[in-house]
Regions:
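N-terminal low-complexity or simple alpha-helical regulatory segments
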Residues: 1-121, 138-142
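Alpha-helical transmembrane segments of multi-pass integral membrane proteins
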Residues: 37-57, 113-117, 138-203, 212-221
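Alpha-helical transmembrane segments and their membrane-interface junctions
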Residues: 62-75, 192-209
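Hydrophobic alpha-helical transmembrane segments and immediately flanking/interface helices
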Residues: 73-92, 204-228
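Alpha-helical transmembrane segments and their immediate juxtamembrane interface regions
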Residues: 91-110, 216-241
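Hydrophobic alpha-helical transmembrane segments
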Residues: 98, 126-131, 196-205
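Membrane-proximal linker segments that couple transmembrane helices to downstream signaling/catalytic modules
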Residues: 228-339, 351-354, 361-373
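Key DNA-contact positions within bacterial/archaeal DNA-binding proteins
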Residues: 295, 345-346
Length: 373
């Protein structure tokens, strides 16, 4: 079996390189609305396509250097691998992070990463020279440290962007939106898994390299499908970021006590009308309805109820749901979830369990047993 895998590995990677080029082409040709909002999205998909092309290029460099023997190694291959892995890291990390934060790719960040890449590439390239052959391992280790520094930095900034986006969604949308960006976090870790496997595969046999190729193909297919699906939600989700940017520019302060006293009866009236049962709305929609602005309303909710906008709306809907479940024990949970404004039964069950400590079905059964006593 091992002999078969070694004999046909070149054919396998040739096919996979074509797959990566095909996926990159699909990304480049995929059309998005020609609006300012999608400018960052278009740049992100081009970066992602560039990363896929670099994976394909890495394969062709390996094919050109492969002698047919799995026990002989070209010492310059790891040098090129480090350089290409660094460029892949830039493409994938910049693409994924900027889909969360449109301002992520700044001139300052690009200048910094360019200097770091130049230094890493310099050590990787001089490690290939005959004059410094005796120092090849130390030089490669220095280059590898440069690669690791870049990856650790991007992991930190990506997680920062991810947490920021979740916080923005919680304070802008009435329904939970974090599931729309979960694929970005998964893709982020899948990519770093690919780099780790790529480094290990430099000095391993055919079996491990076959498995790595299947992993990388699966990762790229996952990213392609999800980035295309994400396009339909991108404009809606970016409203939260645009709103936050405008708020930071305006520098509006928290509402004064007198204004809070004016706003409180309006909020109370809105709650009594049960307008929160509407399926989907944003804090901007509610602010317009209450004749105020988003900044003041958000501050009011935090000070008055001690929670974010989406958590506050969810708590109101949960109380209404429990009332309906008590009055109509035979009702379907799915119908109750939709009637009180939740976008799906799984989301309703998740919020309910987090609040009550049990699922809605268990809660209804317990209520039923208590009523029979």
């Amino acid at each position: 079996m091992i002999h078969f895998l070694e004999q046909h590995f070149v054919e396998l990677v040739t096919i996979t390189s074509i797959i990566y080029l095909t996926l990159a082409t699909i990304l480049l040709l995929y059309q998005t609305p020609d609006t300012a909002v999608y400018k960052t999205f278009r740049r992100s998909k081009r970066l992602m396509a560039g990363g896929m092309m670099l994976i394909s290029l890495n394969i062709w460099i390996w094919i050109a250097s492969f002698t047919g023997s799995w026990t002989e190694y070209n010492n310059w291959v790891p040098c090129f691998d480090i350089i290409l892995f660094y460029l892949m890291g830039i493409c994938f990390s910049f693409s994924l992070s900027s889909l969360l934060d449109p301002h992520y790719i700044s001139r300052k960040r690009c200048r910094t990463i360019a200097v770091k890449f130049t230094m890493t590439a310099f050590f990787a390239l001089i490690a290939m020279t005959d004059a410094l052959k005796a120092y090849q391992i130390p030089l490669l280790l220095i280059a590898l440290i440069g690669l690791l520094e870049m990856l650790i930095g991007h992991i930190y900034y990506f997680n920062k962007c991810y947490l920021r986006s979740n916080a923005l969604f919680e304070n802008y949308f009435s329904n939970e939106k974090s599931h729309f960006i979960r694929w970005l976090k998964v893709s982020h870790w899948l990519f770093y898994g690919m780099l780790i496997l790529g480094v290990i595969s430099i000095r391993t046999g055919a079996l491990f390299n076959w498995l790595v190729q299947f992993y990388v193909v699966g990762m790229n297919l996952y990213i392609l499908v999800n980035i295309i699906n994400y396009a339909s939600e991108y404009e809606t989700l970016m409203k939260a970021d645009c709103d936050k940017t405008e708020e930071e520019k305006s520098g509006e302060a928290s509402p004064k006590k007198a204004y809070i006293e004016t706003l409180r009866p309006r909020v109370t009236e809105w709650i009594q009308e049960k307008s929160y049962l509407k399926d989907q709305f944003t804090i901007d929609d509610l602010a317009t309805r209450l004749y105020t602005n988003k900044t003041y309303l958000s501050s009011f909710i935090k000070e008055e109820f001690g929670m974010s906008f989406s958590s506050w709306i969810a708590s109101l809907r949960l109380e209404e749901a429990k009332k309906m479940m008590s009055e109509h024990p035979d009702a379907k949970l799915k119908d109750i979830a939709y009637n009180v404004g939740f976008s799906s039964l799984p989301y309703f069950s998740s919020v309910f369990a987090k609040s009550e400590g049990v699922t809605p079905s268990v809660w209804m059964k317990e209520r039923g047993r208590n009523a029979e006593r």
